Amino acid sequence: MTDLIRSDAATLAAKIAAKEVSATELTQACLDQIEATDDRYHAFLHIGAHEALSAAAAVDTALAAGERLPSALAGVPLALKDVFTTVDMPTTCGSKILEGWRSPYDATLTLRLRAAGIPILGKTNMDEFAMGSSTENSAYGPTRNPWNLDRVPGGSGGGSAAALAAYQAPLAIGSDTGGSIRQPAALTATVGVKPTYGTVSRYGLVACASSLDQGGPCARTVLDTAMLHQVIAGHDAKDSTSLETEIPDVVGAAKAGASGDLRGVRIGVVKQLRGDGYQPGVLASFEAAVAQLTALGAEVSEVDCPHFDHALAAYYLILPSEVSSNLARFDAMRYGLRIGDDGTHSAEEVMAMTRAAGFGPEVKRRIMIGAYALSAGYYDAYYNQAQKIRTLIARDLDEAYQSVDVLVSPATPTTAFPLGEKVDDPLAMYLFDLCTLPLNLAGHCGMSVPSGLSPDDGLPVGLQIMAPALADDRLYRVGAAYEAARGPLPSAI
């Protein structure tokens, strides 16, 4: 069973299709691993054992009947971030205000996973409403990094990344608002991709910041991530921001990249995303990765994106502004937690009491910042200025891609930091998003692929690869080439 759960998803899918292993056997092995290890990691908030085994049995039945499998990943189980709605499991978004809530509908992404024959093992832990960089803001307790139990796994989707690193699941889904897929991937030596905004449906993704949120695939290899990306991407009429366009051949790009030939590929190193404030071991790993890309034949040059210096400030005005609007729906009137509804309090008092008890400190902080930024006296000075910076950041990237095909940077400024180190220092926590959030502001795509272990502390480091909107295939070509040249890494457990 140990060899089975440590296999990559592509290998497992091939074994299922060849009837060398059953989907039920694999799903049960993953459930057994969760049961044996999750008291240490707390990657999951809810386990859907019955539902997952039923989905796996359906794949086995179809195979036995000689039917064609619904996808290349049919029967390979997955961990789903608890921000996507599911009719058969609770959706809490890591918040007390939604404790025990069950959605009356599946997210479009959830439906696509089910249609592909992918068993959903359960819902993974996350920072409350995807607000955080460490998964310490969950109302249900923090997730621990399998590489070091005293360190964070990143956030907001630390549960999905930890589940992969702990071999609890071969596939996972996250959401990325400012780096919530890529940053945990970097800290756990897994692969995470933020697809182009609008290419993966947001219908049923509980909103944090609607113009920034994007669901995406996570796995332990670039090819596995590409295969999952192919399953979840595509136009959805239920999402008004969904792009009605052809999705790039990400699987083909990953397979082509595995040959290790990057001749003719132009790679830009972002000047603003390295230097002071970065951990020496992270920079050393990044420089080694750039040297490896050069050795594979890529043409590497430095690229200047001057407005990246203002990205953090712009992001932390735009995101809270959208949060303050989106989270107004949690009013204790329709669903979720309700405090003080005993006939002695007005509706306004019930709402205030419920929100005070149901939201955690970081969520309240961002609601307050957003309400202030959107207020009549400060809208132009803060929110409008932030949107102007957002436009300039997108222009920086558009200009950069005139001379290069992809950009690269460290995925995070440091390796995983100790639990509790930044939880009471919001500014330090926000700075951890420095490398990843510019892509969300621009709507472009990005990947974090493991680039080794830091010589400083032996913890994982991630290489971030960035590409223009609708050029997601470039991520997979470069990522797969680098992964093949880098070779295997030690495992967390």
From Swiss-Prot:
Q: Which GO terms describe its cellular component?
A: glutamyl-tRNA(Gln) amidotransferase complex
What Pfam families is this protein classified in? Amidase (PF01425)
Q: Provide the GO biological process annotations.
A: translation
The annotated active site, in chain numbering, is 81 (charge relay system), 156 (charge relay system), 180 (acyl-ester intermediate)
What is this enzyme's class at the first EC digit? ligase
User: Its Gene Ontology molecular function terms?
Assistant: ATP binding; glutaminyl-tRNA synthase (glutamine-hydrolyzing) activity
Spell out the NCBIfam families in the cross-references.
Answer: gatA
| HAMAP family assigned | GatA
Put simply, this protein is called: Glutamyl-tRNA(Gln) amidotransferase subunit A
This chain's source organism reads Mycobacterium ulcerans (strain Agy99)
